[in-house]
């Protein structure tokens, strides 16, 4: 059960931070959202919107995991190409955000998880203030050097499932070097979300670059 006592005494003065979470199918977007929500709620007032093409599977998974109370998670069925719903025509997600903020007007963060997509996926600026883009090691050592907006333009780039490197022949040092070359000074995290390794860096980023940035 979630303790909401810390939420009842707060006075909200700023609009919520909108955080887009993108990445290919199976990279760990839903796991990332689950772990971040469990670590930050109820200290922070959170809501989450998940995108799936034909189902509300990610909403179901987040709810079953206890990431947030069920009423704070809303699933959106986008249909068609998932990146359209976060970029070219984000109206379905903007409506979902408005709907959730009517219920939770004091929200600190609104997470929007995109449907699984390719390396070219980006969030519309009206939908997301910060973007997290996640890939997994099992998809291949070469992924960071392929580039694409998700890798080069996201505010935080996350390389997940580092524990699988020995089993898929991936060299983490090469992936790290390629990431530095493609992103320059932009931050990235090597992590294993199943064990929580690297999660603290993601949360610190959300706080320093989002919630507490002057």
UniProtKB/Swiss-Prot annotation:
GO terms for biological process: urea catabolic process. It is found in: Cytoplasm. GO terms for cellular component: cytoplasm. The keyword Membrane does not apply. Signal peptide: none annotated. The keyword Chaperone applies. CDD domains: UreG. Gene3D superfamilies: P-loop containing nucleotide triphosphate hydrolases (3.40.50.300). Its main location: cytoplasm. It holds the Pfam family cobW. One of its GO terms (molecular function) is nickel cation binding. It comes from the Bacteria. Keywords: Chaperone, Cytoplasm, GTP-binding, Nickel insertion, Nucleotide-binding. GTP binds at residues 23-30. Homodimer. UreD, UreF and UreG form a complex that acts as a GTP-hydrolysis-dependent molecular chaperone, activating the urease apoprotein by helping to assemble the nickel containing metallocenter of UreC. The UreE protein probably delivers the nickel. Facilitates the functional incorporation of the urease nickel metallocenter. This process requires GTP hydrolysis, probably effectuated by UreG. Belongs to the SIMIBI class G3E GTPase family. UreG subfamily. This is Urease accessory protein UreG. It comes from Bordetella bronchiseptica (strain ATCC BAA-588 / NCTC 13252 / RB50). The lineage of its organism: Bacteria, Pseudomonadati, Pseudomonadota, Betaproteobacteria, Burkholderiales. The gene is ureG.
């Amino acid at each position: 059960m979630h303790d909401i006592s810390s939420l009842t005494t707060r006075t909200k003065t700023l609009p919520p931070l909108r955080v887009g979470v993108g990445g290919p199918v199976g990279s760990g977007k839903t796991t990332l959202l689950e772990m971040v929500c469990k670590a930050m709620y109820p200290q922070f007032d959170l809501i989450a919107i998940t995108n799936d093409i034909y189902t509300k599977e990610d909403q179901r998974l987040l709810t079953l995991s206890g990431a947030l109370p069920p009423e704070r998670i809303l699933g959106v069925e986008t249909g068609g190409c998932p990146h359209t719903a976060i970029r070219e025509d984000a109206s379905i997600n903007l409506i979902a955000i408005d709907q959730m903020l009517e219920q939770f007007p004091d929200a600190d963060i609104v997470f929007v998880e995109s449907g699984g997509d390719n390396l070219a996926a980006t969030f519309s600026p009206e939908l997301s203030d910060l973007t997290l883009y996640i890939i997994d090691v099992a998809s291949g050592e070469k992924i960071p050097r392929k580039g694409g907006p998700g890798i080069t333009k996201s505010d935080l780039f996350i390389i997940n499932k580092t524990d699988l490197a020995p089993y898929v022949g991936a060299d983490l040092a090469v992936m790290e070097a390629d990431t530095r070359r493609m992103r320059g000074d932009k931050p990235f995290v090597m992590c294993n979300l199943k064990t929580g390794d690297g999660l603290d860096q993601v949360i610190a980023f959300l706080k320093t670059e989002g919630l507490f940035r002057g």
